[in-house]
Amino acid sequence: MDEYRQAIAPEAPRTLENTGALYVYNNYIFINEQKEGIHIVDNTDPENPTPIAFLKIPGNFNMGIRNNLLYADNFVDLVVMDISDPLDVKFAGRTENVFDSYQFYQDLGYLVYYEESEETVELSCSDLNFGNDFFWMNDGRLVFDAAFSNNAEALSPNVSFDQGGNSIGQAGSLARFSIIDKYLYSISEYDLRIFDLEDPVAAELASTVNIGWGIETIFPYQDNLFIGADHGMYIYDNSDPLNPTQLSLFTHARACDPVYVQGNTAYVTLRDGTECEGFDNQLDVVDITDLSNPKLLASHQMSNPHGLSIRDENLYLCDGRFGFKVYDVSDWRLISSRQLAHVPGFSAFDVITVNGKDLAIVIGEDGLYQFDISDPADPVRLSVLSTGSR
């Protein structure tokens, strides 16, 4: 791993290619280039967003920002970058061996890269590898189950200030990192890892909470954590930041599951897809007045819902290959019949409605789209940063 543990320095801007997590801080947008690093975009003028740098961080999928320090995964490490001057980002620190998303083999080291090819491998039910997500073959090839390989590390404001006076950025609903006060919360497929940022450039892994398999997203709201999984939504009491305790689990059919919370209502999107092994495409509206006993209020049929955001009484929804949609959610019974707007023609998987601005930032396979949402029924496209293949 030493070759990946070099000081990270900004490089010239790159073209977007394989976009992932989306993050907003001050007048800047941070876009994950899956497995490669982070694009920094000056968004002072949303009609003319300007890429200004690329941070090459191998193995990166996730990020969070607190007090001008960017925290990002770098394979099995957590790295810290000083972004006080986004044009001159400085490497600030590293905490080693705190993530286990990559398999370690005693004779070979960490598996961090592979070239993919499609092949059908038949196993008998008595084979020791039957039921495993991945395994090595005798000829040295590594075999992944198709569902597992499609579920690599994915994927709440412009700046807000928490009760401790810390400036925290704004993440999308597919986020797997979340910063609350002086703690960074990170989810893997099965646990929650809590980093103490008392020394902000030397983050300490302070606590690990086992949750269960299929964990996908984390959304903090007030003193609670709402954790989306492929089988439901976990609600945790986070009044003790190092020891979150489970209050409840709202279950649903197996499907991909981001969560957004406003007031006493949680909005959960379910979608089909290989990695989810499900066939539901819907928006669930859940009453969380009693956090220990969440109750389904309604399910609304959607096309292929992904990330979402709520502003006032409007739902901003990324509907996969069907584009970007806006719904009136003032009456939970009527959401599906109250579509206010539909912007087709591009793929959308996550959205941030920027705090204090009539601005929606949407990320997808086609690139980064920005919309003026001063009239929710008529979102106006301001700009596009397209991926290199589009």
Q: How would you describe each model-predicted region?
A:
Residues 1-390:
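Feature marking well-ordered beta-strand scaffolds used for ligand recognition
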